[in-house]
Amino acid sequence: MFRKANAVPQNTSNHILGINIDSQRILLVYGNLSGLISERLEFASPSSAPFPAFLSELSSHADRLLMITQAQRLPLPDVVSVSVAGNYDAKTGVVGSSLEFVQWRAESLRSQLELRFNLPVYAETKANAGMLAEMLFGATGSLSNAFYFTFTPRVRLSLLSEGQVYHNPGATAGSIGKLRLSSSENLPEKAQTLNDVASGLGLLRLAQFRHPTHWDPDLQLPDLLQSALDRDPFALEVIDQAAAIFGCHLECLVHSLRPEKIIIGHPFHLLGEAWLKPMTDALSQASGLGGGELSQIQASALGSRQPELEALAPAIMALRGARER
């Protein structure tokens, strides 16, 4: 169902098939360069499946999405844009082995998607794609030196330096969730790293540990976040603890690089001040920085559209950059 194309059409109305991949769910969107989403489709991620099986299921759902857009007489996409969890090397197009996709072994994600869809593919890690979405659509003004954090499935950092997103061979940079906790007091017995407390899964484990009788055994992250937004004191207590632990563990990073802005991304950006205040207070106390010395800390302003715009951002940034050259 994809147009044969050897080069990206140089017009202002490129249509994009956006794919947001993590170990829990996959989001497909049909959008354009302005970030307008016409259709979306979401399904559970076959993260435990081998890579060929993953590609087959992804292709099947993409066909379903495009059948819907074709019924609306929308053009076929010109490019594919991908945000993917794990260690994706944007230079080689290879996803390395990671806990997110346990059966993947140095898989050629970009070339395989190009082969499947016969379209140019632009891809980034979730954290880097999130940073690009902020640069394109965020209400943050001009970004030059900044941190962007994403929290699902694990805590990951994107570093923006002089307006350029940092990449390293193998795409292992930014795995800040692997930081060892400085203290395990009042934490689950097996909590050893930042991922065990401040990632989406870590937050769920912390909530069950702190108040096991308050939550359903199958508590899901959206339900926990909504409880915090509804001012549930048990949820707020857990958020406060996790955010404070996260903030104090940024001390060395902030002192070393002194970013102008620190942006909290998906999904904890939805918590607003419930996450920002304890995080900021803890970072200020741990670092000794305050007032004008501390980086500006803010939540992404993209709201519930963040995953959709994250999916589109790698292609939009690449296409805009090509036209400016």
Predicted segments, located by residue:
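N-terminal charged helix/coil linker that caps or initiates catalytic domains
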Residues: M1-L17
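Short glycine-rich, Thr/Ser-proximal phosphate-binding strand/loop in the N-terminal lobe
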Residues: I16, N20-F54, V95, S175, ...
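Short glycine-aspartate micro-motif
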Residues: I16-N20, P77-S81, A146-T150, R156-S158
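Short, acidic, Ser/Thr-enriched surface-loop or helix-capping motifs
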Residues: N32, A90, L160
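Glycine/GP-enriched mid-protein hinge/lid loop-to-helix segment characteristic of carbohydrate kinases
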Residues: R40-E42, A49-F54, E114-F117, Y122-A127, ...
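Glycine-rich phosphate-binding loop and adjoining helix at the ATP-binding site
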Residues: P46-S59, D63, M67-N145, E273-Q285
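Adenine-nucleotide phosphate-binding core of ATP-dependent small-molecule kinases
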Residues: P52-Q70, A191-V197, G202-I263, P267-E273, ...
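Glycine-rich phosphate-binding/hydrolytic loop that grips phosphoryl groups
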Residues: Y122-L136, E273-R325
